[in-house]
Design a protein with these regions (language model features):
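Short loop/turn segments that connect beta-strands within beta-propeller blades
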Residues: 28-31, 79-81, 133-136, 185-188
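Short beta-strand elements that form the blades of beta-propeller/WD-repeat-like
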Residues: 6-17, 24-25, 57-65, 118-123, ...
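A short beta-strand motif characteristic of beta-propeller blades
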Residues: 33-41, 90-103, 139-148, 190-196
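Polar, enzyme-active/binding microenvironments
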Residues: 67-69, 80-84, 88-104, 116, ...
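Structural motif
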Residues: 16-26, 67-77, 126-132, 175-182
Length: 210
């Protein structure tokens, strides 16, 4: 979901159609079928991951163009869909750039966004990378941090409500109890705590505030 600048609730939801390489959007209060936006921008692409940034005002997407294997980072304003025609604001692409091989992105990367900030996190095996959307095409060339051992693979990441902590779930196929959980400080990128090999194979991680 994303918000509009003058709203304090989610304005719309976005969906990606891998079969047609298209981004769909729909206002929360709208019960009609989601409509394609930015038609032609993602033709031939499949989604690696997407999320809202900049206090949920904009969307960032990482896609893979299947014909060339090129990964693209697309930063967009998703638009405003009012029932009043004079208040509608069209979606637009802020930038779309190819991600270099040195950026660490791969098919199967977990992609998550710090919604209140301008940062998109993505993974490669047990490594976590971070891209600030304000940096445009200046992608990281080294991991922000690595999690656990090289035999572990990150399967999910989730943030605390204030985005100051990131919880990273991994699986280690070489362990009898493969699932581990790590907590990192997003301000310092330091490990706060870890709980290694505490469960079976992790499929998804969820955060619940006490």
């Amino acid at each position: 979901p994303w918000w509009r600048d003058d709203l304090f609730y989610a304005h719309g939801d976005a969906y990606f159609d891998n079969a047609h390489g298209s981004l769909l959007a729909m206002a929360i209060e709208n019960t009609s079928v989601p409509a394609e936006i930015l038609k032609g921008t993602f033709t031939g692409d499949t989604l690696v991951g997407m999320g809202s940034v900049n206090k949920q005002r904009n969307l960032a997407l990482i896609t893979n163009q299947t014909s060339t294997g090129t990964f693209y980072f697309t930063y967009i304003f998703p638009g405003y869909y009012s029932s009043s025609a004079d208040k509608r604001i069209a979606a637009n692409v802020l930038y779309r750039v190819a991600m270099p091989s040195t950026s660490g992105i791969a098919n199967g990367s977990v992609v998550r966004s710090a919604r209140s900030k301008n940062i998109v996190y993505y993974t490669n095996d047990n490594a976590v990378y971070a891209h600030n959307v304000l940096a445009n095409s200046n992608f990281p060339t080294a991991a922000l941090f690595t999690v656990g051992s090289s035999s572990e693979k990150i399967v999910d990441m989730v943030f605390s409500d204030d985005d100051n902590l990131i919880y990273v779930a991994t699986n280690d196929t070489s362990a009898s109890m493969p699932g581990s959980l790590y907590c990192y400080d997003t301000q310092t990128n330091a490990l706060r705590w870890s709980k290694q090999h505490i469960t079976g194979r992790i499929v998804k991680a969820l955060f619940r505030n006490k």
